[in-house]
Amino acid sequence: MESGKSPLEENLQEFTLKEDSELRFEVANGDVMLELVDGRAEVFGTELIQHKKYVFPAGSRVAVFTWKKAVVELVGKTESAYVAEQTPMIIYLNTHAALEQLREHAESVVMQQEQARGPSLMIVGPTDVGKTTVCRILCNYAVRVGRTPIFVDLDVGQGSISVPGTVGALYIEKTADVVEGFDKKAPLVYHFGNLSPGSNIPLYDLLVKQLAEAISKRRKSSQDATYGGVIINTCGWVKGEGYACLVNAAEEFEVDVVIVLDHERLYNELQRDLPSFVKILHQPKSGGVENRSKEVRISSRNAFVHKYFYGTRAMPLYPHTFELSFDEVQFCKIGCERLPIECLPFGMKVDDHRTKVVPIEPSEDLVHHLVSLSMCTAVDQSVLTTNVMGFIVITAVDMEREKLTVLSPQPYPLPSKILILSEVTFIDDKERT
């Protein structure tokens, strides 16, 4: 005899959360719907609205936290779902309060001190300690007290502002959507073209410097940005050259505060190597953070690129596929083969080959590669330090007809003819008519 319940209703779970506790759940296959039935609660710093239904797709990992108490319902199949009574949220709230004090101090001394500005905070730590989540919480808390912080993501492998292989910044004017995250309508994005800083450290350091300078100009031109401060996410590579990249980023962004998540050695090394005026804090990671396998990381990157072109079920996008003639575009890449010292042009440094912009000819090797659309009008060194306007994927190359087929967020023609090759690939498996 049938129960008469839908498959979703068969999987209904209700949780009563005590003060300072959180419900942690991971979505299995299919969707899970979250509803706040009673009380007050938040997801990564964004408040939930009572009786609004939030639908999370497969693979989502979510923490629903309450400062007082709450009753929440989950409908759908979860991989896991449990209530944790020990969380680091009070630590993150205290961090937010300290940052807000620094913002208020900057406002109060602006009449006497022209250089007063809100805090620049950098969050560091190895992979899988929850750096991106802490950034999201602190940005959301800042917005909830009327601030407009700038969020910077220097993680080229698992970034949350744009597609993999980029660094970028986002002006945060409203709290993140509970399911979709921050509004990414107008990010400032630079092309790196690889998934690890180690593939081209001179280029990575140069882009960090460029991004820091662009943000400094933005802060000088806007009072809200000046006082709102900067919150910086970083890569999980914390040893050797990766550590040097972190120190360089701290210097370029002139950070005031560094939070080290769950890594005592890194905390001690930064205490030794950063200026004494930088406040360095060691904080625990959340117990809800789990180590991600290589396969999960690859899947996460592919999902991010897929979302860029296709959106989500709640907010779908409809990309375009069309052909381009070879002569309609100019391809280039950053970095070339190292020449022997005796063959270098006069004045060129040995490292310069890593940051040289070189034109390339279309070939079948381009298939499945992401390509950045530069705002430049010619292939020259300005491509290196100019932000990009968007991305396409090369889905086919016909050498006989001299035609490319591309997946693009907008219809023909492309807004730029200067295309920068990325080593990041994406296989578009959607069939469109």
Curated annotation (Swiss-Prot):
Amino acids binding ATP: 22, 61, 128-133
Q: Which GO terms describe its molecular function?
A: ATP binding; ATP-dependent polyribonucleotide 5'-hydroxyl-kinase activity
Q: Pull one GO CC term from this UniProt entry.
A: mRNA cleavage factor complex
Q: Organism's domain of life?
A: Eukaryota
Q: What is its main location?
A: nucleus
Keywords in alphabetical order, please: ATP-binding, mRNA processing, Nucleotide-binding, Nucleus
Q: Where in the cell is it found?
A: Nucleus
Q: Which GO terms describe its biological process?
A: mRNA 3'-end processing; tRNA splicing, via endonucleolytic cleavage and ligation
| Role according to the record | Required for endonucleolytic cleavage during polyadenylation-dependent pre-mRNA 3'-end formation.
Family recorded in the similarity comment? Belongs to the Clp1 family. Clp1 subfamily.
Specify the protein name.
Protein CLP1 homolog
